[in-house]
Amino acid sequence: MTRVIVISNLRLAQAFVDYMATHHVALEIRPDAQGVEIWLADDEQLSAVQHELEQFLLDPLNPRYQAASWQAGNVNSNLPYQRFSYLQTLRSQAGPLTLSVMVLCIAIYILMLITGDMAVMSWLAWPYNSSQYLQIWRWVSHAFLHFSLLHILFNLMWWWYLGGQMEKRLGTSKLLVLTIVSAVFSGWGQSLFSGANFGGLSGVVYALMGYVWLTGERAPEHGISLPRGLMAFSVLWLIAGYFDILGLSIANAAHVSGLIIGLLMAFWDTRNSARTVQ
């Protein structure tokens, strides 16, 4: 038997197995620490399965896969769907860096509530002038500042969703590099327009959006992706920020800078990928 792939989503794995069954290919699902494994009994069918898998990874939510489950008369796997607590779900979908940044942001936000924004910003904000340039933590620490509950919830939700899958699939070092690079460049871009009076993880989040989306489009075998609809919404939200539609103070330059950095890093990292969008 040959292991074909590991998929984190059991329902998607079942849909692919059922779809291949309609092509007279028998696949088996087995539990795995990262989700489930799909195994092929007949090695002679491997090339056909790999071809269909490529198509599946490009569009796993295509109705033909769900329709195959109904045709096979099997909409559930024999594997149990376990119930997890919110904390277990949070931890299972994130690595140590993802969780550490979340804890750090929450701790700093609580400190800002207690001591006031300016007291914390005096230590962590983007360098105010050249005398602070050697305080190198400032080039990144501004990303951990948040000024409202909605601000921190929105950013940490995206950070967990995108950073978690990136760290799980590509490793902690890859996420660390993207976080540092995007924090520096998004902070620099925003400082050109607002000085040092800004903060938030959104520049890094937009870098993650760009990286995860483009990597998923060009190299789906890496196992990370952002649905096109969510990416389109994010771009529209970015554009809306320039028109002050919601009356919010938005770090537009940080968003744009972060998105560009994420796209550039993803393009570079997938430059040798054989699977690109046609």
Swiss-Prot record:
Catalytic reaction equation(s): Cleaves type-1 transmembrane domains using a catalytic dyad composed of serine and histidine that are contributed by different transmembrane domains
Gene Ontology molecular function terms on file: serine-type endopeptidase activity
Chain segments annotated as coiled-coil in the UniProt record: none
UniProt cross-references to Pfam families, sorted A to Z: Rhomboid, Rhomboid_N
GO biological process entries: proteolysis
Topology in membrane: Multi-pass membrane protein
Transmembrane segments: 94-114, 143-163, 175-195, 196-216, 224-241, 245-267
Cell inner membrane keyword on record: yes
The enzyme's E.C. designation: 3.4.21.105
GO cellular component: plasma membrane
UniProt keyword terms in alphabetical order: Cell inner membrane, Cell membrane, Hydrolase, Membrane, Protease, Serine protease, Transmembrane, Transmembrane helix
Residues at the catalytic site: S202, H255
Signal peptide from the UniProt entry: none
Enzyme category, top tier: hydrolase
Family in the record: Belongs to the peptidase S54 family.
Protein name: Rhomboid protease GlpG
Gene that encodes it: glpG
